[in-house]
């Protein structure tokens, strides 16, 4: 009888330990997912901020009438002619205005 009671106590401890391990695994999974999403959001925010900076520098170039502006590592080129206006960041065309 004593052996049976001792076995039940060990079984209860084992079940509690198993539940704790499962809970820890679930917590670790949730934490990993959250941290991954936070990292992804930060990367997206950095891309958005970079695009905003490019557009700000392009706006400055247009407002000042300069053909080339380089600020904070962002280089903008403005090509204007009688037919229209084009604004570039590297090889990417940001704006194109042409007369009909």
UniProtKB/Swiss-Prot annotation:
Which compartment or compartments is the protein found in?
Cell membrane; Cell surface
Asked whether the UniProt record includes Transmembrane helix among its keywords, one would answer yes
State the signal peptide span: none
The annotated topology with respect to the bilayer is: Single-pass membrane protein
Pfam families documented for this protein:
ComGE
Cell membrane as a keyword of this entry, yes or no, is yes
Indicate the transmembrane segments per the record: 15-35
Q: Which domain of life is it from?
A: Bacteria
Q: Which UniProt keywords apply?
A: Cell membrane, Membrane, Transmembrane, Transmembrane helix
The record's subunit annotation is:
The transformation pili are flexible filaments, consisting mainly of the major pilin ComGC and smaller amounts of the minor pilins, including at least ComGD, ComGF and ComGG, and perhaps ComGE. Interacts with ComGD. Interacts with ComGF. Interacts with ComGG.
What is this protein identified as? Competence protein ComGE
Q: What species does this protein belong to?
A: Streptococcus pneumoniae (strain ATCC BAA-255 / R6)
Identify the coding gene. comGE
